[in-house]
Amino acid sequence: MQQLEEVVASALAKIAEATDNNALEALRVEYFGKKGVFTEQMKALAGLSPEERPAAGQLINQAKEKAQNALNERREALTTAELAKKLAAETIDVSLPGRRFENGGIHPVTRTIERIERIFGELGFSAEYGPEIEDDFHNFDALNIPGHHPARTDHDTFYFNPTLMLRTHTSGVQIRTMEKQQPPIRIIAPGRVYRNDYDQTHTPMFHQVEGLLVDENISFSNLKGILHDFLLNFFEEDLQIRFRPSYFPFTEPSAEVDVMGKNGRWLEVLGCGMVHPNVLRSVGIDPEKYSGFAFGMGVERLTMLRYGVNDLRAFFENDLRFLKQFK
């Protein structure tokens, strides 16, 4: 009995002095393992008489339980202390400002497209869209562009085969609209177009917005009035605007529109003209009854003029230092 009390006292003292879970594990093996102190005590019961065994066994179990409880409590205390130490080392100062997540911005080209759509929407135009892979008829034939025209050469057009290509303008949308809708027609056609060119003012892919108005008694003065209103609204300035004669196979007469730049020089901004009678005939519209005008503008060029950008390629290089200026 006295020896058992000494065993328990020794076990409790060692458990109390343990400083980590590894030390506690060693004590568990020492006292409760297969060859542990309490295991040996239980084996020693075999040497007692049958009358003595129950009482002795009860004492050993009580001593074992006392030591086991002390071991469990110490393990829990050490685990709690270790967790508290870890949490203290990883403490977050909740009073500090959080990480700053920057909101994205609308790309300047997208801004320009949305601006153009809004202005023409206020002028009564609706936006129409069409396929970027276009056939020969909608991209060329229906627009009065003959087979010998330079625009049909491989130098300007990305061909899939002799009759299928990446569209070189959004004029095909105008043709498709006139095929399915009789006048009055009042649309713009924004979208991506493709031409085989790459330099400071050209990229193989760029954006265009083309417009079409077809109705009875439409004249060139109607065209001038619409474009004049658009340019003044787009640039938000009382600009000098001029129309000078030009040539496009799908309009007659044709003109190019210039605005006076801040440097005192004229800057070309778009092309336009009265829809050629052959174009109206190709889609089943009587040119004796209806007339119309069309216009087209490069979105990137307008964006460059509006924001003072010198190199068109900057819009497609994804340089955040450049793009953040337009947020």
From Swiss-Prot:
Presence of the UniProt keyword ATP-binding in the record: yes
UniProt source species: Tolumonas auensis (strain DSM 9187 / NBRC 110442 / TA 4)
One Pfam family matching this protein: Phe_tRNA-synt_N
GO-annotated molecular function: ATP binding; magnesium ion binding; phenylalanine-tRNA ligase activity; tRNA binding
Entry protein name: Phenylalanine--tRNA ligase alpha subunit
Domain of life of the organism encoding this protein: Bacteria
Family recorded in the similarity comment: Belongs to the class-II aminoacyl-tRNA synthetase family. Phe-tRNA synthetase alpha subunit type 1 subfamily.
Localisation: Cytoplasm
Enzyme class: ligase
Cofactor: binding details: Binds 2 magnesium ions per tetramer.
Lineage, highest ranks first: Bacteria, Pseudomonadati, Pseudomonadota, Gammaproteobacteria, Aeromonadales
Entries under CDD domains matching the protein: PheRS_alpha_core
